[in-house]
Amino acid sequence: TTESPSLLRHSEVETLFHEFGHILHQTLTRAPFSRFSGTAVERDFVEAPSQMLEHWAWDSDVLASFTRHKDTGEPLPQALLDQMTKAKNIGSGIHYLRQIYFASLDLAYHGTNSITDSDRLARELHEITSFEFPENTHFQAGFGHLFGYDAGYYGYLWSQVFGDDMFTRFEKEDPIDVGRDYRKFILEPGGSKDAETQIVDFLGREPNNQAFIEEIGLDISSD
């Protein structure tokens, strides 16, 4: 408005970083054919670069470089970021159950069995969430990823495992050097190489889910 600027929630900042991850993937490609350029990779890898970049939306130095209080001009206080980080995984169990439900429903709708009652299938699979099914809402009619992203919604979770694992290199090594490798091994090839090969080339090892498990706040250590 004329009296107040447009402000971003932190979740919207995360989304900005996420989409910028796709932009980098698309603009820095050096694939020899357009068919395999940029984000033209396997559907269950395409979200890995974008979700990896979301980690920077939680980095104190990055946030301090551009966040400002609309009245005082002060950057985001470290104490506030610390509290945000502590609260990051509140409700994460519900979030991931919801994601698993959406992915399962997407795969079921686009599976080999003929579907004549979309509500019935949505109701049956809703047990995954442990919540009561909201009758007469027909939420699937507004589930945009069912169209154009068909049978690929599971790729968000699958890609997050890769994205979290790739970020571990940035945490452990000089981010400038790692960034060069990231550009060379992940962004430049596009779909001209198998995603699994790209990940191994970048990490120097087979990927695993340890970083993902830690990122979502699970403790799977044995007593």
Question: Each PLM stretch: what is its role?
Answer:
Residues T1-F17:
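Short pre-active-site segment immediately N-terminal to the catalytic Zn-binding motif
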Residues L16-E19, I23-P32, G38-E47, M52-D59, ...:
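C-terminal, non-catalytic "cap/extension" segments appended to globular domains
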